[in-house]
Protein backbone atom coordinates (compact mmCIF):
# COMPACT_ATOMS: atom_id res chain seq x y z
CA UNK A 1 0.00 0.00 0.00
CA UNK A 2 2.87 2.36 -0.77
CA UNK A 3 1.68 4.19 -3.87
CA UNK A 4 -1.38 6.38 -3.59
CA UNK A 5 -4.13 5.56 -6.09
CA UNK A 6 -4.89 8.12 -8.83
CA UNK A 7 -8.26 8.71 -7.18
CA UNK A 8 -9.31 7.97 -3.63
CA UNK A 9 -12.19 5.56 -2.99
CA UNK A 10 -15.29 7.43 -1.81
CA UNK A 11 -16.84 5.74 1.24
CA UNK A 12 -20.29 5.77 2.84
CA UNK A 13 -20.89 4.19 6.28
CA UNK A 14 -24.29 2.51 6.70
CA UNK A 15 -25.33 2.40 10.36
CA UNK A 16 -23.72 4.57 13.03
CA UNK A 17 -24.00 2.45 16.16
CA UNK A 18 -20.89 1.23 17.97
CA UNK A 19 -19.14 -0.35 14.96
CA UNK A 20 -20.22 2.42 12.58
CA UNK A 21 -18.93 5.11 14.94
CA UNK A 22 -15.54 3.37 15.10
CA UNK A 23 -15.46 3.17 11.30
CA UNK A 24 -16.25 6.90 11.01
CA UNK A 25 -13.43 7.69 13.45
CA UNK A 26 -10.95 5.47 11.60
CA UNK A 27 -11.87 6.95 8.22
CA UNK A 28 -10.66 10.30 9.56
CA UNK A 29 -7.32 8.77 10.56
CA UNK A 30 -4.34 10.00 8.48
CA UNK A 31 -3.63 6.37 7.52
CA UNK A 32 -7.02 6.24 5.78
CA UNK A 33 -6.71 9.58 3.99
CA UNK A 34 -4.21 8.28 1.43
CA UNK A 35 -6.72 5.85 -0.08
CA UNK A 36 -10.20 6.58 1.26
CA UNK A 37 -12.43 9.64 1.23
CA UNK A 38 -15.36 9.66 3.68
CA UNK A 39 -18.38 11.06 1.81
CA UNK A 40 -21.11 10.56 4.41
CA UNK A 41 -23.21 8.13 6.41
CA UNK A 42 -26.63 6.51 6.11
CA UNK A 43 -28.88 6.09 9.15
CA UNK A 44 -32.56 5.38 9.74
CA UNK A 45 -32.43 8.09 12.41
CA UNK A 46 -32.56 11.74 11.34
CA UNK A 47 -29.19 12.99 12.56
CA UNK A 48 -28.25 15.62 9.96
CA UNK A 49 -24.52 15.28 10.61
CA UNK A 50 -22.10 13.59 13.01
CA UNK A 51 -18.75 15.19 13.81
CA UNK A 52 -18.98 17.22 10.59
CA UNK A 53 -19.81 14.13 8.49
CA UNK A 54 -23.06 14.63 6.57
CA UNK A 55 -25.99 12.25 6.55
CA UNK A 56 -27.17 11.12 3.11
CA UNK A 57 -30.14 9.01 2.05
CA UNK A 58 -29.71 5.37 1.05
CA UNK A 59 -31.03 6.20 -2.44
CA UNK A 60 -28.43 8.96 -2.90
CA UNK A 61 -25.64 6.69 -1.63
CA UNK A 62 -26.60 3.99 -4.13
CA UNK A 63 -26.79 6.49 -7.02
CA UNK A 64 -23.78 8.66 -6.19
CA UNK A 65 -20.84 8.58 -8.60
CA UNK A 66 -18.70 9.90 -5.72
CA UNK A 67 -19.24 6.73 -3.67
CA UNK A 68 -17.22 3.61 -4.57
CA UNK A 69 -17.41 1.74 -1.26
CA UNK A 70 -20.06 0.97 1.38
CA UNK A 71 -19.22 -0.03 4.97
CA UNK A 72 -22.22 -2.01 6.28
CA UNK A 73 -22.32 -1.53 10.08
CA UNK A 74 -26.05 -1.97 10.70
CA UNK A 75 -27.69 -4.77 12.70
CA UNK A 76 -26.99 -8.25 11.29
CA UNK A 77 -30.55 -8.88 10.11
CA UNK A 78 -30.22 -6.05 7.54
CA UNK A 79 -26.76 -6.97 6.19
CA UNK A 80 -27.93 -9.19 3.34
CA UNK A 81 -30.27 -6.57 1.87
CA UNK A 82 -27.73 -3.74 2.10
CA UNK A 83 -24.91 -5.83 0.60
CA UNK A 84 -27.12 -6.85 -2.32
CA UNK A 85 -28.23 -3.26 -3.02
CA UNK A 86 -24.71 -1.82 -2.96
CA UNK A 87 -23.21 -4.62 -5.08
CA UNK A 88 -26.04 -4.21 -7.60
CA UNK A 89 -25.17 -0.49 -7.69
CA UNK A 90 -21.55 -1.38 -8.52
CA UNK A 91 -20.04 -0.52 -5.12
CA UNK A 92 -17.38 -2.45 -3.18
CA UNK A 93 -18.61 -3.66 0.23
CA UNK A 94 -17.03 -4.06 3.66
CA UNK A 95 -19.47 -5.67 6.12
CA UNK A 96 -19.24 -6.39 9.83
CA UNK A 97 -19.59 -10.12 10.64
CA UNK A 98 -21.73 -12.07 10.07
CA UNK A 99 -22.22 -10.99 6.46
CA UNK A 100 -25.57 -12.79 6.35
CA UNK A 101 -27.75 -14.96 8.59
CA UNK A 102 -27.87 -17.80 6.07
CA UNK A 103 -25.30 -19.85 4.15
CA UNK A 104 -27.33 -19.76 0.91
CA UNK A 105 -27.62 -15.95 0.96
CA UNK A 106 -23.85 -15.61 1.48
CA UNK A 107 -23.20 -17.85 -1.54
CA UNK A 108 -25.50 -15.68 -3.68
CA UNK A 109 -23.73 -12.50 -2.57
CA UNK A 110 -20.24 -13.86 -3.33
CA UNK A 111 -21.51 -14.77 -6.81
CA UNK A 112 -22.98 -11.29 -7.26
CA UNK A 113 -19.70 -9.65 -6.16
CA UNK A 114 -17.76 -11.78 -8.67
CA UNK A 115 -20.28 -11.00 -11.43
CA UNK A 116 -19.99 -7.25 -10.72
CA UNK A 117 -16.20 -7.40 -10.30
CA UNK A 118 -16.41 -5.87 -6.83
CA UNK A 119 -14.69 -6.61 -3.50
CA UNK A 120 -16.86 -8.16 -0.77
CA UNK A 121 -15.01 -8.18 2.56
CA UNK A 122 -16.35 -9.61 5.82
CA UNK A 123 -14.71 -7.99 8.85
CA UNK A 124 -13.07 -10.33 11.36
CA UNK A 125 -11.32 -8.14 13.93
CA UNK A 126 -11.28 -11.07 16.37
CA UNK A 127 -8.44 -12.55 14.29
CA UNK A 128 -6.45 -9.33 14.82
CA UNK A 129 -6.73 -9.42 18.62
CA UNK A 130 -3.71 -10.00 20.84
CA UNK A 131 -5.57 -12.85 22.58
CA UNK A 132 -5.97 -14.71 19.31
CA UNK A 133 -2.32 -14.17 18.39
CA UNK A 134 -1.35 -15.66 21.80
CA UNK A 135 -3.60 -18.69 21.22
CA UNK A 136 -2.30 -19.17 17.68
CA UNK A 137 1.29 -19.30 18.93
CA UNK A 138 0.37 -21.67 21.78
CA UNK A 139 -1.58 -24.06 19.54
CA UNK A 140 0.91 -24.15 16.66
CA UNK A 141 2.25 -27.66 16.02
CA UNK A 142 0.28 -29.26 18.88
CA UNK A 143 -2.27 -32.05 18.56
CA UNK A 144 -5.60 -31.38 20.25
CA UNK A 145 -7.21 -34.12 22.33
CA UNK A 146 -10.17 -32.08 23.53
CA UNK A 147 -11.02 -28.50 24.30
CA UNK A 148 -13.70 -25.95 25.02
CA UNK A 149 -14.46 -22.31 24.31
CA UNK A 150 -17.22 -20.75 26.40
CA UNK A 151 -18.47 -17.22 25.90
CA UNK A 152 -20.74 -15.35 28.31
CA UNK A 153 -22.47 -12.00 27.83
CA UNK A 154 -25.65 -10.06 28.49
CA UNK A 155 -28.75 -10.86 26.38
CA UNK A 156 -28.86 -10.09 22.65
CA UNK A 157 -31.96 -9.71 20.49
CA UNK A 158 -32.09 -12.66 18.10
CA UNK A 159 -34.42 -10.80 15.71
CA UNK A 160 -31.74 -8.16 15.14
CA UNK A 161 -28.50 -10.10 15.53
CA UNK A 162 -29.43 -13.62 14.46
CA UNK A 163 -29.37 -17.10 15.97
CA UNK A 164 -26.54 -17.54 18.54
CA UNK A 165 -24.39 -19.53 16.10
CA UNK A 166 -24.41 -16.47 13.80
CA UNK A 167 -24.17 -13.69 16.41
CA UNK A 168 -21.31 -15.68 17.99
CA UNK A 169 -19.58 -16.55 14.73
CA UNK A 170 -16.36 -14.80 15.81
CA UNK A 171 -15.83 -17.54 18.42
CA UNK A 172 -16.44 -20.24 15.80
CA UNK A 173 -13.97 -18.42 13.53
CA UNK A 174 -11.36 -18.61 16.30
CA UNK A 175 -11.82 -22.39 16.56
CA UNK A 176 -11.69 -22.95 12.80
CA UNK A 177 -8.64 -20.66 12.43
CA UNK A 178 -6.85 -22.49 15.25
CA UNK A 179 -7.78 -26.11 14.48
CA UNK A 180 -8.86 -26.25 10.81
CA UNK A 181 -12.19 -27.28 9.36
CA UNK A 182 -14.57 -28.85 11.86
CA UNK A 183 -17.38 -31.42 11.73
CA UNK A 184 -20.60 -30.90 13.66
CA UNK A 185 -21.46 -33.71 16.09
CA UNK A 186 -24.33 -32.23 18.12
CA UNK A 187 -25.97 -28.94 19.09
CA UNK A 188 -28.54 -28.03 21.73
CA UNK A 189 -30.22 -24.78 22.75
CA UNK A 190 -31.59 -24.15 26.23
CA UNK A 191 -33.84 -21.10 26.45
CA UNK A 192 -35.78 -19.37 29.21
CA UNK A 193 -37.27 -16.41 27.38
CA UNK A 194 -39.03 -15.06 30.45
CA UNK A 195 -35.58 -14.76 32.11
CA UNK A 196 -33.84 -13.55 28.90
CA UNK A 197 -31.51 -16.54 29.28
CA UNK A 198 -30.11 -18.83 26.61
CA UNK A 199 -27.32 -21.40 26.40
CA UNK A 200 -26.18 -22.99 23.15
CA UNK A 201 -23.89 -26.01 23.45
CA UNK A 202 -22.17 -27.33 20.33
CA UNK A 203 -19.93 -30.39 20.01
CA UNK A 204 -17.43 -30.30 17.14
CA UNK A 205 -14.66 -32.57 15.89
CA UNK A 206 -11.35 -31.69 14.23
CA UNK A 207 -10.04 -33.59 11.21
CA UNK A 208 -7.66 -35.39 13.62
CA UNK A 209 -10.60 -36.50 15.82
CA UNK A 210 -9.97 -33.92 18.55
CA UNK A 211 -13.18 -32.93 20.35
CA UNK A 212 -14.26 -29.33 20.86
CA UNK A 213 -17.12 -27.85 22.86
CA UNK A 214 -18.37 -24.39 21.93
CA UNK A 215 -20.74 -22.75 24.39
CA UNK A 216 -22.55 -19.40 24.03
CA UNK A 217 -24.34 -18.37 27.23
CA UNK A 218 -26.26 -15.12 27.56
CA UNK A 219 -28.40 -13.70 30.32
CA UNK A 220 -28.86 -10.75 32.70
CA UNK A 221 -25.85 -10.31 34.98
CA UNK A 222 -23.50 -12.41 32.84
CA UNK A 223 -20.30 -10.49 32.15
CA UNK A 224 -18.72 -10.48 28.71
CA UNK A 225 -15.96 -13.06 28.95
CA UNK A 226 -14.23 -15.94 27.16
CA UNK A 227 -13.11 -19.13 28.87
CA UNK A 228 -10.79 -21.55 27.09
CA UNK A 229 -9.51 -25.01 27.99
CA UNK A 230 -7.47 -26.95 25.45
CA UNK A 231 -5.89 -30.33 26.24
CA UNK A 232 -3.06 -31.40 23.93
CA UNK A 233 -0.97 -34.55 23.69
CA UNK A 234 1.80 -32.30 25.07
CA UNK A 235 0.25 -30.27 27.90
CA UNK A 236 -2.73 -27.98 28.26
CA UNK A 237 -3.85 -24.36 28.00
CA UNK A 238 -6.45 -23.24 30.52
CA UNK A 239 -6.58 -19.47 30.22
CA UNK A 240 -5.69 -16.58 27.96
CA UNK A 241 -3.57 -13.98 29.75
CA UNK A 242 -4.85 -10.42 29.95
CA UNK A 243 -3.12 -8.61 27.12
CA UNK A 244 -4.52 -5.13 27.64
CA UNK A 245 -6.27 -3.04 25.01
CA UNK A 246 -6.43 -4.29 21.43
CA UNK A 247 -5.23 -1.21 19.56
CA UNK A 248 -6.53 -0.16 16.15
CA UNK A 249 -7.99 -3.54 15.21
CA UNK A 250 -10.71 -1.98 13.03
CA UNK A 251 -8.06 0.16 11.34
CA UNK A 252 -5.98 -2.98 10.69
CA UNK A 253 -9.05 -4.68 9.23
CA UNK A 254 -9.57 -1.64 7.00
CA UNK A 255 -5.95 -1.92 5.84
CA UNK A 256 -6.67 -5.49 4.68
CA UNK A 257 -9.76 -4.25 2.83
CA UNK A 258 -7.79 -1.48 1.11
CA UNK A 259 -5.19 -4.04 -0.02
CA UNK A 260 -8.07 -5.92 -1.69
CA UNK A 261 -9.31 -2.72 -3.35
CA UNK A 262 -5.80 -2.14 -4.71
CA UNK A 263 -5.59 -5.77 -5.93
CA UNK A 264 -2.66 -6.47 -3.59
CA UNK A 265 -4.02 -9.72 -2.07
CA UNK A 266 -3.24 -12.97 -3.90
CA UNK A 267 -6.01 -15.08 -5.42
CA UNK A 268 -4.90 -17.95 -3.16
CA UNK A 269 -5.28 -15.86 0.01
CA UNK A 270 -8.69 -14.55 -1.11
CA UNK A 271 -9.88 -18.10 -1.86
CA UNK A 272 -8.63 -19.41 1.51
CA UNK A 273 -10.38 -16.58 3.37
CA UNK A 274 -13.65 -17.12 1.49
CA UNK A 275 -13.45 -20.88 2.16
CA UNK A 276 -13.04 -20.24 5.91
CA UNK A 277 -15.89 -17.71 6.00
CA UNK A 278 -18.24 -20.06 4.13
CA UNK A 279 -17.22 -23.04 6.28
CA UNK A 280 -18.13 -21.06 9.42
CA UNK A 281 -21.43 -19.83 7.95
CA UNK A 282 -22.22 -23.39 6.84
CA UNK A 283 -21.57 -24.72 10.35
CA UNK A 284 -23.69 -21.92 11.86
CA UNK A 285 -26.58 -22.82 9.52
CA UNK A 286 -26.29 -26.53 10.40
CA UNK A 287 -26.16 -25.73 14.13
CA UNK A 288 -29.31 -23.60 13.83
CA UNK A 289 -31.16 -26.39 11.97
CA UNK A 290 -30.11 -28.99 14.55
CA UNK A 291 -31.20 -26.85 17.49
CA UNK A 292 -34.57 -26.09 15.87
CA UNK A 293 -35.16 -29.78 15.10
CA UNK A 294 -34.82 -30.59 18.80
CA UNK A 295 -37.36 -27.99 19.93
Swiss-Prot record:
UniProt-listed InterPro entries: Biliverdin_Rdtase_A (IPR017094), Biliverdin_Rdtase_cat (IPR015249), Gfo/Idh/MocA-like_OxRdtase_N (IPR000683), Gfo/Idh/MocA_Oxidoreductases (IPR051450), NAD(P)-bd_dom_sf (IPR036291)
Keyword annotations: Acetylation, Cytoplasm, Metal-binding, NAD, NADP, Oxidoreductase, Phosphoprotein, Zinc
Entry binding sites for NAD(+): 18-19, 76-79, 97, 167
Main location (coarse class): cytoplasm
Compartment list: Cytoplasm, Cytosol
Gene3D superfamilies linked to this entry: Dihydrodipicolinate Reductase, domain 2 (3.30.360.10), NAD(P)-binding Rossmann-like Domain (3.40.50.720)
GO cellular component, one term: cytosol
Homology family: Belongs to the Gfo/Idh/MocA family. Biliverdin reductase subfamily.
Protein name from the UniProt record: Biliverdin reductase A
Gene: Blvra
Amino acid sequence: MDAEPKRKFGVVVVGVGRAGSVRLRDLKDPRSAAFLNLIGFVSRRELGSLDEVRQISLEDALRSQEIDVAYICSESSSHEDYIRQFLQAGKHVLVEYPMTLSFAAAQELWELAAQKGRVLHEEHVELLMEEFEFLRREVLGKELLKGSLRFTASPLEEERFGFPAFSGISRLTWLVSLFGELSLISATLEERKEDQYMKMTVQLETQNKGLLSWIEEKGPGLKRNRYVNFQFTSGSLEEVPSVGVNKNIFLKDQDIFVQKLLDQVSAEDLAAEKKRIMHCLGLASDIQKLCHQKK
